[in-house]
């Protein structure tokens, strides 16, 4: 779910000081085969803002807070999202009926991205931490930057910041 409160940085409060609002410009979503963390409409007039946004991405890539208290808070957030989608969006209810047909015979056939609320309520913390370590690794992530900037400079910034991250010794492929 959303890692907006990364372990190293106070991400959400800082982003809001530059006009990047939580929910509208700073958010995340999970589909059947990817999780996307998004920072949008960040003002790039100041070089420092670009650097700070890259630091936010770096924080998300390896310093997610998986302490029990934070996990339990997110369980509540997931429940609220599930409830809102079920009561307010016919599209969500339709997808719950259509997805098993669309994905018949695949590993996605019986699982919606938001999950089963019984599992959300009862999974052991260790299971989530193990899953995170297995699949939410920097070597399985991509960074997409869109805007009016010098591409070569941006590539150098990304390589300098993210190139320091060590690869996992036993990746789960």
Tell me what each language-model feature is.
Residues 13, 64-83, 150, 169-173:
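Acidic/histidine-enriched alpha-helical segments
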Residues 142-173:
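An aromatic/glycine/proline-enriched structural segment found at the starts
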Residues 39-74:
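M16/insulysin-pitrilysin zinc metalloprotease superfamily fold
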Residues 43-46, 85, 149-151:
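Solvent-exposed loop/turn segments at secondary-structure junctions
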Residues 2-3, 28-33, 49-56, 60, ...:
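Scaffold signal of the M16-like zinc-metallopeptidase fold and its non-catalytic homologs
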Residues 36-39, 137, 141-147:
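Short cationic amphipathic helices and targeting signals
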Residues 1-40, 110-114:
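M16/MPP (pitrilysin/insulinase) zinc-metallopeptidase core fold and M16-derived inactive scaffolds
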């Amino acid at each position: 779910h959303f890692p907006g409160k990364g372990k190293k940085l106070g991400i959400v409060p800082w982003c809001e000081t530059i006009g990047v609002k939580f929910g509208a410009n700073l958010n995340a979503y999970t589909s059947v085969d990817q999780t996307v963390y998004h920072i949008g409409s960040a003002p790039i007039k100041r070089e420092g803002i670009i650097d700070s946004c890259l630091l936010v991405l770096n924080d998300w890539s390896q310093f997610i807070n998986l302490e029990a208290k934070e996990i339990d808070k997110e369980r509540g957030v997931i429940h609220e999202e599930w409830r809102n989608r079920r009561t307010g969006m016919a599209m969500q209810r339709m997808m719950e009926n259509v997805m098993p047909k669309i994905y018949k015979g695949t590993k996605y056939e019986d699982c919606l991205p938001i999950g089963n609320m019984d599992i959300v309520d009862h999974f052991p913390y260790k299971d989530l931490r193990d899953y995170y370590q297995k699949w939410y690794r920097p070597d399985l992530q991509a960074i997409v930057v869109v805007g009016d900037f010098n591409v070569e400079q941006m590539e150098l910034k990304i390589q300098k910041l993210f190139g320091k991250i060590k690869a996992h010794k036993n990746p789960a492929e």
